[in-house]
Amino acid sequence: LNNCEEIEIKVAQGAKPGEGGQLPGFKVTAEIAKLRHSTIGVTLISPPPHHDIYSIEDLAQLIFDLKQINPKARVCVKLVASSGIGTIAAGVAKAKADVILISGHNGGTGASPQTSVKYAGIPWEMGLTEVNQVLTLNGLRQNVVLRTDGGIKTGRDVAIAALMGAEEFNLGTTSLVAMGCIMVRQCHSNTCPVGVCTQDEDLRERFSGTADKVVNLFSFIAEEVREIIAELGFTKLEEIIGRTDLLSQISRGSSHLDDLDLNSLLIQAEKDPEVKYFNHTGINDAGTTLDEKIILDAVKFFETGQKTELNYSVKNTDRTIGSKLSSFIYNKFKNSKINDDQITLNLTGSAGQSLGAFAVKGLTLKVEGDANDYVGKSLSGGKIVLRPDKHSKINSKDNTILGNTCMYGATSGYLYAAGHAGERFAVRNSGATTVVEGCGSNGCEYMTGGNVIILGLTGDNFGAGMTGGMAFVYDLDKKFRYRVNEETLVYQGIQSNYWENVLKSFINDHYNETNSLHAKKIIDNWESEVSKFIQICPKEIMNSLVEPLVEDTKEKKAT
């Protein structure tokens, strides 16, 4: 993220709006597994819902987080053309996105189901004009750049998109065709006959595409756009953006065929022809955070790398603590080795959204109090510790200490929380280790790696879509089997000394970090308490484990 010039939040795809997708296991090579933090040969699932985006406010928080990590990068939000998209786009603009991409139904996602490609979505023209009109009427048009895609192939398409309000244009399928794609729509099968979309080394040798071919394509398209602009009497593309008055609906040759009224697409929300659209050249500022003060206070750490400990009182309006600091740590030390706990922030109070989001190795956040949603989102090597206020009389194992969607997409690092987590805990965790004392519904969904230890009850739908990693649950009520999918997961008691030692080590670490009385009770009575734990593992990775779940060689049926 630190090196990006633009970051795109893909809310949906034009070719299959509202649908997810998957990468079949036979396409998950060693290289892809490394990049995706997953297991070789195990199917990767891309779910339809965004578990961290349930409202415009959630999207605004994600944009805010990304701008803390890299304030120089543009943030683009991809929306699918649909009825009522103007209202959504207005919210996205208010959320301080820099670019809004309107995607049409003609997109060339070759792995999409044919029913979706043929019948789902609407043309980008309908979505683009509505968005341009709504943003203009609400005084938001100058705050964002409008971009469109979905079957744009020629200079005429580009010119029409510009007249309808677009300032930028994506040409994906057309570029692939220039590189050799012949549109056989076998992208999901690993059998692309021209080597464009396959991991098969023999087929990849057939790939004949070069950068020059794409340059030639774009040169011809640009020339066609120039000719159209000249015919209209203008000299620059910027001069025709939003000029729908230069468009008109043409007849299809007969009155009974002209039953489609496109006048709504040709309405100019701003009638003043002198209004200029292409004027959003900067990047929307996300505002200041506590991290800016922390960075100033940590000047000696950045100068000498010496171990540093800082103390702050926080409130729930202090959002994204540690993210901008993590960006500075990465840019300062890069790939040089930095020890754990090299800089520690001791926080007291209620931390706001996204505590420790993207936190890197070397950074430790210790909170005495509680935290809101998104704790440890995309955790990247850092450590987060939460425990109740030392004067609190509540029992940690019976109370919630952090909100929803915590450890979402974490790749490495640690989270220890003396209390319950909310819903959607550790979704898409792919390498981090975390110990909490209970969680809500949809825990460990789509998880591909790492370790999750729940010292308490879980909600329903635990481990749905989980294809990697290991989970341990303290099954007090003996009803965990009703909250998990038996078809995809193996769940059983601890039947291996190796995994028992792993579990006990994690709980010991949890106690050492949080002083949890609940964890201490389990450790002190280990011989009787270990039998209450359930170990959960995806069936797909059973042959890839460092140690088998059961020590003896005889197969035992999972409980």
Model features per residue range: what roles?
Residues 1, 20, 27, 47-58, ...:
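Catalytic cores of large soluble enzymes that bind and process phosphate-bearing ligands
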Residues 1-149, 154-183, 190-198, 237, ...:
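Alpha/beta enzyme core
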Residues 1-40, 165-263, 268, 476-481, ...:
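Mobile "lid/hinge" segments at catalytic clefts and subdomain interfaces of large enzymes
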Residues 63, 225, 530:
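Generic structural marker for isolated residues within well-ordered, non-membrane alpha-helices
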Residues 70, 132-135, 139, 225, ...:
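Alpha-helix capping/termination and helix-coil
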Residues 79-87, 145-156, 178, 234-250, ...:
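A glycine-rich phosphate-binding loop feature that marks nucleotide/adenosyl-phosphate handling sites
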Residues 203-204, 215, 228-232, 241-244, ...:
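Long, distal/terminal scaffolding or interaction modules
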